[in-house]
Amino acid sequence: WSHSRLEELPALADSTWQPLPVREELPEETTVERAPTGDGTTLTISPLPSGGAHSLQEIYRENIASIVSIRGSKGDGMSLGTGVVMSEDGYIITNSHVIEGCGAVDVVLQDERVFQALLVGQDAQSDLAVLKIDCAGLTPAQFGDSTLLEVGDAVAAIGNPLGEELRGTMTDGIISA
């Protein structure tokens, strides 16, 4: 797409066109008015500490130890997914659909240790499940207050979308209305 092609579109021909600013030209801070977000349950990693934003690389390094793989056995097959360490004493959060219908569930830590998990509870509507493994000294993710999030806030997600086959992936985006 080029600027010269804008003239070919009547609706855009009379508009003022300017390139988007590059990163160095962006303001250091952007304010977005709070928008209604509904009353659903949300689980988030804590907001960045005051004093500046972290790079995606820093966020990754600070949180990758808290990301685990989930393996569930279902009849002749397996269910694979991601979990997040919630506490030092072995509580893990995952998606309910990952463990739904599984006879046994294993949690694989970043250091390759495998633990059989007990289901503490799950809620299909919010698609959340809490598991417990017999392991102490884990590195939990830092969870924050989701009521502090605003539309437009930057977020990042780290996970193992295919269990152990595709580990440690990361994506970023924004909170949308």
Give each language-model segment a name.
Residues 2-177:
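Serine-dependent protease modules
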